[in-house]
Amino acid sequence: MAQAVEEWYKQMPIITRSYLTAAVVTTVGCSLEIISPYNLYLNPTLVVKQYQFWRLVTNFLYFRKMDLDFLFHMFFLARYCKLLEENSFRGKTADFLYMLLFGATVLTGIVLIGGMIPYLSVSFSKIIFLSNSLTFMMVYVWSKQNPYIHMSFLGLFTFTAAYLPWVLLGFSILVGASAWGDFLGMIAGHAYYFLAFVYPRMTDRRPLKTPSFLKALFADEPVVIARPEDVRFAHAPFDEIHQD
C-alpha cells in the first residue's frame, strides 16, 4: 500500500506534486500547531503596512483542519490539477504555472476590490483563505476543456463534465454550505478560459502570454497523458472560505 502511494506520488507532474505537497505540509503543520493560521491568512493591511507579502501565497495553501472535508479537497486538487497538467497543458508546464498565478491574482483582486465596496465589504472581509477557490478554478477550466466526458454524482444521475462546476455549486447550496469559494473560483476560471482560449480564436490575439522567465524555468518534456474516467464523487462543503 505504502509503495503504491509512493509510486502514485512520484508519477505526479511537477506543479501538481509541488502544490499538493505544500498544501498538505501547511495544513498538517497548522493541525500540529507548528504553524499558526494567523500567520497565513490574507490580510491586505498587514501585506501593505507590515510587508508580510508571504500572505499573498500562503492563503492558497491552507485548507483548514484535517478532516473528511480536507480529504475531499485534496482529492479534487490532486485529480484535476494533474489532469490539466498532463492533458490540456501537456509539455507546457510554464503555461500551467502561469494559469495558476493568473487565477491567484484574479481571486486576490476580487477580494481586495470587494472589500472596498459598500454593503459587500463585510462579506469579502471574511474571505481570508482562497485555497478552495483556486482548486475550484482548476475544476472549472478542466470542465471547459473536457465538456463531453460523462460523470456520475453519488450514483444518482449522470451528466457531462461541462456541468460539473454547476453540480458542485448546487450541491454546496443544497447542503447549506457557503458557495462563495465555488463562485469565486468559477469567475477566475471563466476569466482565464475566455482570455486564453476564446478571445484568441475571436481576434487572433493572445492577451495572456506566459513570461519568458517562466518558460526558462521548465524544460517542456512530453508526459504520459492521463485518461479521465467516469467517476463517482461527493463534494465537500466549502464553508471554510468564510471565517468569523
Curated annotation (Swiss-Prot):
The chain crosses the membrane at residues 22-42, 97-117, 122-142, 153-173. It is found in: Endoplasmic reticulum membrane. Pfam families: DER1. This is Derlin-2.1. It is a multi-pass membrane protein. One of its GO terms (cellular component) is endoplasmic reticulum membrane. Coiled coil: none annotated. Belongs to the derlin family. GO terms for biological process: response to stress.
